[in-house]
């Protein structure tokens, strides 16, 4: 049995890609997209029809060019998501514009609009996860959306404070970033030789997973942003893992046994009183890595969102 199939015995495997051909090849349960992945996929010839449809939608929407581009951009994200859903049995994650990361009300409005666009393509909201950055405002937006039956995936998650606040808000799923945490520490004090058990990104997800299980939070933990297969194998047993096509390929080509590393704890603890905004901001602020990586992640997604909009504007 190859390692990918071995992992699938213990963990739901999710494809971290907007490339539909890759998704079909690796047969994941779910798929995640983001502006960076959509920008990459939009440059591939085989997806031209999805872009043309989004452009036509933008023109039909009318208004200023800026409004047409915004409409086309939302439609493109949904077109990719709907196309991906034809190849997977589970859910697709579609991201709310990162520029709304500090605006609760506009994030809620955008999420409802994306769900509406999916429903116009006969895609039920039970097959969609709305991705939001795990800022205080994003978490509060998700809390409201969950009450409306719109499940959310809280992304760009780097600190324990972010994870705990998401669980306390009743968020459906979180995506703690393994690789970007590893990158930050590696740039400052490299792990040489590399020992996966000492990888700060791996340790972060393990701590979150254990805490959620010990306190019986139902929020799903989906490890994300991997740099190497060792990180993935060290988190086998995590609820879900979202993996890029290049690492899915490596795992599929290795015929080595896979051992479950994360197992729900039999120890149970009472849940603490939910964090206040002040407590959240203080706890998150105490983690220099998390502060830096969350800010950077929002900026990078915003840059790629603008590039995607420029690509669409040139075609309008």
UniProtKB/Swiss-Prot annotation:
The record's listing under Gene3D superfamilies reads: Aldolase class I
- Main localization is cytoplasm
Q: Where is the active site?
A: 131 (schiff-base intermediate with substrate)
Which InterPro entries does this UniProt record tie to the protein? Aldolase_TIM, TAL/FSA, Transaldolase_1, Transaldolase_AS
Origin superkingdom: Bacteria
Q: Which GO terms describe its molecular function?
A: transaldolase activity
- Write down the EC number: 2.2.1.2
**Pfam families in UniProt:** TAL_FSA
Q: Which GO terms describe its biological process?
A: carbohydrate metabolic process; pentose-phosphate shunt
Q: Could you give one GO CC term from the UniProt record?
A: cytosol
- Keyword annotations: Cytoplasm, Pentose shunt, Schiff base, Transferase
According to UniProt, the reaction catalysed is: D-sedoheptulose 7-phosphate + D-glyceraldehyde 3-phosphate = D-erythrose 4-phosphate + beta-D-fructose 6-phosphate
**Which biological pathway?**
Carbohydrate degradation; pentose phosphate pathway; D-glyceraldehyde 3-phosphate and beta-D-fructose 6-phosphate from D-ribose 5-phosphate and D-xylulose 5-phosphate (non-oxidative stage): step 2/3
Localisation = Cytoplasm
Main enzyme class = transferase
Q: How does it assemble?
A: Homodimer.
Protein's job: Transaldolase is important for the balance of metabolites in the pentose-phosphate pathway.
Query: Into which family does the record put it?
Result: Belongs to the transaldolase family. Type 1 subfamily.
Instruction: From the Swiss-Prot or TrEMBL record, give the protein name.
Output: Transaldolase 2
